[in-house]
């Protein structure tokens, strides 16, 4: 009998979300755990497996599940391992696909979280019908899933498309990956918070943000201040969008995509981030690309796109 469901798991730096998905792309049920709560990988896998088993039981047990797909930072599709992910609590090489298979007795496939989001957009979202596009995930870090001629670009080792760790500012901010000046230290949600702290420390402008503990400021705090008209908060988003737009202008030159689709928590800022990104992308692109590349917001709920994309892997799971 054909198995009617697949599982999608999205592992982020803050939350891990998982869901049961049917063949039409409907998420039947889902759950989540806090990623950062678990400093030890075996404890994390145990709790994640318990949560996944609960939603499997709700649809009649593992006999109804075709496979499990996982999207994770630095996830390697070829090996099923998470390798040296700077925004996760566990370091080194983690054979996550095998660990989950051992606990759940269901085959597991794993890929980069941005690749999973790209699959979700191509199958169910803003990239339907497109063959050449890039999905940019803006969350704890910056990820990118590149699709060329309808195929995800993995590279020879599974790690193609690490836009977040290309250099935005020479000798700039220290990144968790060990490099300095990486794009994600400026243009992720955590990058926005870092910019806010720097501005508050080095400038004297009045700002609603000065009422907060600088070490606890989040990108949402900056957004809340900006929508109230706070000049400093608006400048923070302008700076963030400038760096991101300049990077996109370079990125476009490699694959000439039809569209760049923005996905993740930071896009909740809407025009505050979208407008400066578009402006600086267009200003810095080669003339042959100008006004040809669509800049789109994800059409899928933030939690849904990555879960749906990861679940697509579950339908075509391979053994490691």
Can you name each region flagged by the protein language model?
Residues 1-67, 77-81, 98-106, 123-130, ...:
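ATP-binding/phosphotransfer module of carbohydrate and carboxylate kinases, centering on a glycine-rich
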Residues 10, 69-73, 111, 135-141, ...:
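Short beta-strand segments
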Residues 31-33, 86, 156:
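Short hydrophobic alpha-helix segments
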Residues 35-37, 90, 160-162:
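A short acidic/small-residue loop/turn micro-motif
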Residues 81-93:
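A charged helix-plus-loop insertion that forms the helical arch/lid used to bind
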Residues 87-90, 109-115, 135-138, 296-304:
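Active-site nucleophile and cofactor-binding loops and adjacent substrate-binding regions
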Residues 111-125:
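Conserved PLP phosphate-binding loop immediately N-terminal to the Schiff-base lysine helix
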Residues 128-187:
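Glycine-rich phosphate-binding loop of actin/hexokinase-like ATP-binding domains
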């Amino acid at each position: 009998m054909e198995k009617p469901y697949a599982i999608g798991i999205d592992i982020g730096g803050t939350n891990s979300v998982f869901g049961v998905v049917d063949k039409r792309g409907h998420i039947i049920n889902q759950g989540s755990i806090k990623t950062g709560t678990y400093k030890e990988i075996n404890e994390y896998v145990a709790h994640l497996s318990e949560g996944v088993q609960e939603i499997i039981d709700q649809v009649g047990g593992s006999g109804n599940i075709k496979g499990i797909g996982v999207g994770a930072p630095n996830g390697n599709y070829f090996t099923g391992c998470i390798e040296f992910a700077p925004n996760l609590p566990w370091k080194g090489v983690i054979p996550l696909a095998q660990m989950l298979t051992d606990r759940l007795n269901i085959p597991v496939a794993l890929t980069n979280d941005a690749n999973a989001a790209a699959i979700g957009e191509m199958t169910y979202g803003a990239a339907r019908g497109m063959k050449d596009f890039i999905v940019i995930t803006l969350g704890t870090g910056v990820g990118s899933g590149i699709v060329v001629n309808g195929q995800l670009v993995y590279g020879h080792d599974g790690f193609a498309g690490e836009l977040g760790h290309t250099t935005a500012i020479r000798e700039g901010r220290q990144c968790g990956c060990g490099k300095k000046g990486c794009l994600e230290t400026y243009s992720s949600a955590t990058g926005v918070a870092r910019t806010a702290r720097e501005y508050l420390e080095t400038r004297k402008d009045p700002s609603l943000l000065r009422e907060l503990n600088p070490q606890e400021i989040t990108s949402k705090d900056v957004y809340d201040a900006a929508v109230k008209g706070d000049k400093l908060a608006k400048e923070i988003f302008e700076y963030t969008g400038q760096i991101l737009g300049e990077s996109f202008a370079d990125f476009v030159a490699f694959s000439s995509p039809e569209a760049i689709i923005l996905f993740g928590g930071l896009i909740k800022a809407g025009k505050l981030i979208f407008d400066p990104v578009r402006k600086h992308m267009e200003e810095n692109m080669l003339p042959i690309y100008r006004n040809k590349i669509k800049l789109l917001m994800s059409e899928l709920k933030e939690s849904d796109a990555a879960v749906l994309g990861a679940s697509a892997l579950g339908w075509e799971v391979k053994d490691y």
